[in-house]
C-alpha cells in the first residue's frame, strides 16, 4: 500500500499502476491522484479479447480455482475418483460449483481431472456451454414463462439448488460482482440441507462471501458442515501467480510504450477504462460516483 513517504515522492511525472479497487474504496486511489500522478487500476481491465493479455484478475482467478480444489481434496476425507478395488468400489466425490467465472471454471476443470463428478451452475445462459465443455453437468433451473424480478429469480434459483447441494460432498462458490458485495447464493436453509461432513469453500469471502455463514480467512462449522473462507489462495501458488502477473505487466507496458516512453492514450479501448486519475483529477465515472456518494464500505462503516 502507498502511504506517507511513498506518496510524498510522487509527482505529476509519475504513473502508478496497481490493484487499487477504487470502485469498492476510492480513497487509496484518491490519495495518489492528489499528488498529480496518473493512476491505472488493474482491476478495471475491460472484458475484451485485446484486454485479456493484461487481465490480472483472470490470471489470479485461474490460480485460485486450481488451489481451491487441491485444498478441498486435502481437507475432505474421501477420494475424488471412482476406484474399483479388491476391497470394493469407491464412488467418486460429488462436487457442485456455483459461479462459472474464471475461478469457478478452473475449479470444475481441476476437479474433473481428479476424477470427481462435477455439476456447475451460473445464472448466465452463455455460461452453460462453458460448463459442459469441461465435462461437467450444467445445472439448469426452470423458470416461469413470464418476466421475473431479480428477487424472484434469486429465490427460485436458491430453492432449485437445494437438492444438488444436499447430494454434494463439496460445494465451491465463486460468484463475484466487481465493486460490490458478493451476492448471497447459499442461504441458511441451503446449508441445513447439506449432508453431514460436507465441505463448502467460498472463493468470494473477501467481499462478504456467497454463503451466509462465511467468515473471511476463517473455518466455520455450522451443524456438521464445514465452511472455509480463504481470501489469498493465489499466494499458495506464488511462483505461478507471480509469473502470470509479470506477464500481464509486460503486456501492459508494451501497450503504454510509445517511442521509448510511457504514454497514456485516452482513446485506447484498454487503457482508458483502467484510467482512474490523471493531472490530479479523478476521471473514472464510477469512481467519481463512489466519492460523491461516500458509500465505500469502509467509509459507510
Residue ranges of model-derived segments:
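An N-terminal-biased, well-structured beta-alpha scaffold segment characteristic
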Residues: 1-31
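A structured beta-alpha segment of the ubiquitous adenosine-cofactor-binding alpha/beta core
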Residues: 2, 144-171, 175-192, 230
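Alpha-helix C-terminal capping/helix-to-coil transition sites in glycosyltransferase folds
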Residues: 12, 166-167, 195-196
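Rossmann-fold NAD(P)-binding glycine/threonine-rich loop
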Residues: 20-54, 180-237
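Adenosine-phosphate binding glycine-rich loop
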Residues: 43-87, 211-300
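Glycine-rich phosphate/diphosphate-binding loop of Rossmann-like nucleotide-binding domains
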Residues: 79-168
Amino acid at each position: 500500500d502507498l502511504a506517507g513517504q511513498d506518496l510524498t515522492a510522487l509527482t505529476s511525472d509519475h504513473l502508478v499502476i496497481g490493484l487499487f479497487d477504487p470502485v469498492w474504496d476510492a480513497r487509496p486511489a484518491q490519495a495518489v491522484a492528489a499528488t498529480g500522478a496518473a493512476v491505472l487500476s488493474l482491476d478495471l481491465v475491460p472484458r475484451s479479447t485485446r484486454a485479456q493479455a493484461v487481465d490480472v484478475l483472470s490470471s489470479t482467478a485461474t490460480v485460485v480455482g486450481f488451489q481451491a480444489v487441491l485444498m478441498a481434496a486435502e481437507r475432505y476425507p474421501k477420494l475424488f475418483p471412482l476406484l474399483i478395488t479388491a476391497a470394493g468400489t469407491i464412488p467418486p466425490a460429488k462436487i457442485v460449483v456455483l459461479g462459472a467465472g474464471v475461478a469457478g471454471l478452473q475449479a470444475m476443470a481441476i476437479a474433473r481431472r481428479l476424477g470427481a463428478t462435477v455439476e456447475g451452475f451460473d445464472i448466465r445462459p452463455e455460461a452453460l456451454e462453458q460448463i459442459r465443455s469441461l465435462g461437467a453437468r450444467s445445472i439448469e433451473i426452470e423458470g416461469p414463462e413470464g418476466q421475473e424480478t431479480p428477487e424472484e429469480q434469486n429465490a427460485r434459483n436458491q430453492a432449485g439448488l437445494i437438492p444438488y447441494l444436499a447430494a454434494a460432498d463439496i460445494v465451491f462458490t465463486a460468484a463475484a460482482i466487481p465493486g460490490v458485495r458478493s451476492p448471497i447464493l447459499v442461504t441458511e436453509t441451503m446449508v441445513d440441507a447439506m449432508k453431514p461432513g460436507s465441505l463448502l469453500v467460498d472463493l468470494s469471502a473477501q467481499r462478504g462471501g456467497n454463503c451466509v455463514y462465511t467468515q473471511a480467512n476463517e473455518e466455520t462449522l455450522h451443524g456438521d458442515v464445514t465452511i472455509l473462507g480463504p481470501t489469498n489462495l493465489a499466494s499458495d501458488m506464488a511462483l505461478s501467480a507471480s509469473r502470470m502477473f509479470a506477464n500481464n505487466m509486460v503486456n501492459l507496458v508494451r501497450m503504454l510504450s510509445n517511442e521509448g516512453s510511457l504514454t497514456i492514450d485516452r482513446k485506447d479501448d484498454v487503457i482508458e477504462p483502467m484510467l482512474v486519475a490523471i493531472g490530479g483529477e479523478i476521471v473514472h465515472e464510477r469512481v467519481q460516483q463512489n466519492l460523491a456518494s461516500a458509500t465505500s464500505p469502509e467509509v459507510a462503516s
